[in-house]
Amino acid sequence: MNISKAKLLLLPPPLTPKLNRSLYSHSQRRTRSLPHHRDKPINWNSTHSFVLHNPLLSLLEKCKLLLHLKQIQAQMIINGLILDPFASSRLIAFCALSESRYLDYSVKILKGIENPNIFSWNVTIRGFSESENPKESFLLYKQMLRHGCCESRPDHFTYPVLFKVCADLRLSSLGHMILGHVLKLRLELVSHVHNASIHMFASCGDMENARKVFDESPVRDLVSWNCLINGYKKIGEAEKAIYVYKLMESEGVKPDDVTMIGLVSSCSMLGDLNRGKEFYEYVKENGLRMTIPLVNALMDMFSKCGDIHEARRIFDNLEKRTIVSWTTMISGYARCGLLDVSRKLFDDMEEKDVVLWNAMIGGSVQAKRGQDALALFQEMQTSNTKPDEITMIHCLSACSQLGALDVGIWIHRYIEKYSLSLNVALGTSLVDMYAKCGNISEALSVFHGIQTRNSLTYTAIIGGLALHGDASTAISYFNEMIDAGIAPDEITFIGLLSACCHGGMIQTGRDYFSQMKSRFNLNPQLKHYSIMVDLLGRAGLLEEADRLMESMPMEADAAVWGALLFGCRMHGNVELGEKAAKKLLELDPSDSGIYVLLDGMYGEANMWEDAKRARRMMNERGVEKIPGCSSIEVNGIVCEFIVRDKSRPESEKIYDRLHCLGRHMRSSLSVLFSEYEITNN
C-alpha cells in the first residue's frame, strides 16, 4: 500500500481526550520505540520489538467504539505499522472477532491491504461464520480464491470454519464442493479438517457421504468415530450407532463421554434398558467424566426406558442441576403418567423458562390430559413467559384431544398476532387441530397456506379428510403427495386406508394395502391390518378378513380381533364372532366392550340363552361397563359429562332438562311418523 495515498484516504480524525491521553502515556514510556517514519516507513516484521510491543496494538484491546478503532488505524498508516503483516492482521482480527464485531469494516481493511496473509482472511471468514449472516463467509472465501496470492492460500484453519457453516445451515451439497477443494489441496490428511467434513455431513443428515469420507480416510481418531456415532443417532439410526461403536471397539479405540452420550441416547430411542445399563456401568468402571450432558442423557435414557427411580437417583445426586436436568426429570415423570410428581418438581423450580413450561405442557398432552395442558398454558401467560413454536404445537395437540375448536382458533389468532412463522411443524399442527375439531374447510385453508409441505403435512390432511368421510379427496391429496416426490410413511397409510374404510372403497383399499410393500417398501403394521379387517368386515367379506389375519407375520392384537368381532355382529356370523370373542377374552377378560358386542350379536341372532350367558359371565367376573364420556366447549371452556354422573351440583336440573328434551323428541318423531303414514297411504 502506498503510504501517501493511504494518508489522503484516511486522515486521522481528532483524537478523543481519553485515547489521546493513552497514546501520550505510552509514547512517554517508549519514546525510542515509536519513531516517525512518514517519508520512508520501515517494512516491519513480526519479530521486531517495535511491532510486538507497539502501544497502538495494545490499545486495540481497549477499543469500544469504531471511532477509536479508526483513530488507531490512522496512526498505524502514518507510522508505517499497517505494512507489517502481523500488525495489520491484529487490526483485522480485532474488527472481526472482538465483542463489538465491526465485520464490514474488517472487510474494508482487508481489501485495502495489498497482500493480506491467510490469518487475516481466516479470522474475517470466522467472524462472518459466527454472525447473523454466516453465508457471507462463503462469499469472502470466493474472494480469497480469486485473490490468488500464495500468502492467502486456504489452509487447514480455513476449511473447518466453512464446514461448520455448512453444518449449521444444512448445506450438504455446498459442503461436498468445498470437500473437493480440500482434496485438491491435499488437506484431507489433517485430522481436524477430516473430522470437520464428517461432522458437516452428519449434521446435514447425509450419513452416506459421512460414512464414505470416514471409510476412505487413513486418519481416524476418536473424534471421527464420535462424529459417526452421534450422526447416526441424530437421524434415528440407533442400531447403526451402536454397530459403529462395536467397530470402534474392535480397532482398539477407547470411548469418551461424547461417545457415551451418543450410545446412551441411542438406547433411549430403542427403549433398550439393558444395553443402557451396560453403558452406564462402563462409564463408572472406567472413570469416564460424568459431564452434565452425559448425566442428562443417562437420566433421559432411564426415564424413557421405564426406570424412573434410577433417573431420580441420578438427579438427586447431582451437585449442579441445569435447566436441562430439571426438564429431563419433569418430562420423564410426565411420560410415565406421574403428572403430580412432575408438577411438584415443576413448582420447586424458582425460575421457569419456556423449555420447562413446554416440558410440563407436553407431558400433560402425552398423558392425554388436554385440559391440564391448556390450564398450564394460561398459567404460563400470567407468568410473563413468552410461548414459542413448541408451546403452540403442544397446545394445538391438546385442542385436538378435547375437540376444543374455540381455543384452537384463539391459538391460531395468537400465532398470527405475534407473527410466529407458520413453518411445516406449526402449520401441520393447525391442520390436524382443525380437522379433528370438525372444521375441515379451515384445515384445507391452512394446508394450502403452508409454503413448504412434507409427509407430515400431507398425512395430517389425508387423515383429517378420512375422519370426515371424504375418501375421494383424501386419495387425491395422496396422489398429489406422490407427484410432488414426497414419500409416504406408515402413518400416511393409516389415514389412506381409513379413508377407504369410511368410503366403503374395498378394491381401492386392497390395492393400497398391497402397494405398501410392493411400491413403497413399507411393512404393514398391526394398525394397518386392523383397518383392513374392519374394511372387509363392514363389507361382509368376513372369510377374506379371516384369511388376511391368518397371513399376518405377527400375532393379531385386540384391535384386529375387535374389528373382526364388530363385522361378525354386523353381519350375523356367530361362529366366526365367537372365535374372535374367545381370543379377545384371552387378551383382556376385563374389557366390557367384548361382552357388550357378544351380547348384541347373540341378541340379533335370537340366541337369547347365549346372550344371557354372556351377561352372566360379565357379572361373575366383576366386569362393569365403562361409562361413556362426552365433552362440550362453552366460551372456550371444555366441560366433560359422564353417563349417569350425578356429582355435579346442578345434576337434578340437568336430568330434568334431558327428560324434557327426550319427551319433545319423542313427540316430534310421532308427528313425523304420522305424516309419513298419511303421505304414503
Curated annotation (Swiss-Prot):
Listed transmembrane segments: none
Keywords linked to the UniProt accession: Mitochondrion, Repeat, Transit peptide
Pfam families hit by this protein: E_motif, PPR, PPR_1, PPR_2
Region (Type E motif): 560-635
Broad class of where this protein is predominantly found: mitochondrion
GO annotation terms (biological process): RNA modification
Region Type E(+) motif: start-end pairs: 636-666
Transit peptide: 1-32
One annotated GO molecular function: RNA binding
Gene Ontology cellular component terms for the protein in this record: mitochondrion
InterPro entries assigned to the protein according to its UniProt record, in alphabetical order: E_motif, Pentatricopeptide_rpt, PPR_At4g14850-like_plant, TPR-like_helical_dom_sf
Entry similarity comment: Belongs to the PPR family. PCMP-E subfamily.
This protein's name: Pentatricopeptide repeat-containing protein At2g22410, mitochondrial
Organism of provenance: Arabidopsis thaliana (Mouse-ear cress)
